Amino acid sequence: MYTDKRNILQLASLLKAHNVRKIVLCPGIRNLPLTQTLANVPEFTCYPMTDERSAGFFALGLALHDGTPAAICCESGAATQCLHAVVSEAYRQKVQVVIISAGKDRLLLPTKKSVTLPEVKTEEDEQLCNRLINEALLELNHHGKGPVHINLCVNEPFLLLPVSDLPEVRVIRRYRGLSIYDQDYKPLIERLNRYQRRMVVVGQMNLIYLFDKRYTKLLYKQFAWIAENIGNRTIPGQPIKNIDPLLTSMNREEQEKMHPDLLITYGGRIVSDRLKRFLMKHPPTEHWHISPDGEAEDTFDALTTIVEMDPFEFLEKIANMIDSRTPDYPRQWETRAKSVPQAEFKWSEMSVIGNVISSLPPASTLLMANGSAVRYSQFFDVPKDVEVISCCGTGGADGTLAAALGYASVSTNLNFIVLGDLSFLCGMNALWSKNYGSNVRILLLNNGGGEIFHAQPGLTIDEGALPYVTGSHTRNAKSLAEDCGFIYLSASNEAELQSCLPQFVSMATGGKPVVLEAFTDATEDIEILKSYFRELKNPIY
């Protein structure tokens, strides 16, 4: 019989799946349900030992014997402190030892990977436990072997309740490249060819990669390709980019029909919340993440496989291994995406960004701050030879202007920096440094505060709280821009913007950088945006 505590059940199932079969068990009240459960798993060989220090070194010896991992289980707190010496020895000898502790304490040892599992009260808690355990056990043998530490929060009651079977759990596997000498990857390719509904989603990538034409022809029609502008040109063909309007225009039945069976991802952050909700609500059977560092990026709570290699090398390697038949799935996505009309907005932040993007000169760089600037750019087609950069890895307004100026200072292109008023106000000290040249163009979107706060579904902000929630203000950038040597332009309507754009996108500015400040109304911006999405749900076209 096993405990009913789901973090322990997840751990037991994943220890078995990751071939951790030798476990040294130390007595203790807090780890009682854990010890009883592990001792009852028939696939485990368990060794009782009272002294934690001795138990740790005993586990080290077990792991040294045949090179397979061994585990030591004890209470947290003082008992875990006794294991510092064995952790140090295992780390230096690169031996796979799993330290498992249970208690209220969140003490973590300095191992290759240390995680704390919460008590499971919701499905989200259980999903988190599953991912953390997988990450820790994968790290036992990743860029060298070594110890890991898994700490469980275990609270009373400690009774062993009658759970007769371990649960079926998600097991994340890692392939280190696609070399037959490192790991047999044939089952991976067999699974790839088994699925007909295959999708590739590309996250943020600060580069341009041009695929050989032979690979483009082999790959493009085999997958539905989805990317945001911050993914740049890193796809063998033209991806679907109008993902937010497209998903909004789909009803529930259509979304269910269009979800992928196999999802492959590469690159960094994905900004679209609608895309994330779609893939979490309709999860793929398998999610493969391809990255050179082999990290477990579980963006959609569906990760099953990590392939540790350059994503472009991966795609070019599988190109000749994919069955030659062309599935209908990519064509369905492409046709559906083309059915959504091009977005058109009256005067607003969206229309300003659209006008600037359509006016970008060849071989320029578009540097977007986090959040709204990135989302709104997705409504428009960025020219193919324009590189897109954004500080959206962690989120937040801090440092976006300084990072963009740093990039522009060593770039020979015209650099168009798009950011909101709060991002500008947070980072305006960077303008005093003068570590930039005449190739800087700043599009400042000023709607008197944080527009994104008005966009939250169901949120009503009363007048008294408005300055605190949205950072509302009445400032403009004219004096600061001119003091710092910028040409200052401003627009409060479409006609004024059109008169400013030729100078804003020109190289001939007398050796000066340029700020274009566009004034809009936050409430109107959001109403225009919401009206657009309402129309997509109830189309009149």
Residue spans for each PLM region:
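N-terminal cofactor/phosphate-binding cores enriched in small/glycine residues
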Residues: 3-73, 79-88
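Active-site diphosphate/adenylate-binding microenvironment
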Residues: 8-19, 26-30, 34-39, 332-412, ...
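Glycine-rich, anion-gripping cofactor-binding loops and their flanking helix/strand elements
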Residues: 64, 75-76, 82, 202-288, ...
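A short, small-residue-rich loop immediately preceding and capping a beta-strand
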Residues: 21-24, 45-47, 65-102, 259-267, ...
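Thiamine diphosphate
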Residues: 40, 100, 107-113, 379-541
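Glycine-rich, acidic loop regions that bind phosphate or pyrophosphate groups
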Residues: 90, 100-136, 227-334, 434-435, ...
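Conformationally flexible catalytic loops at phosphate/diphosphate-handling active centers
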Residues: 2-3, 132-135, 139-194
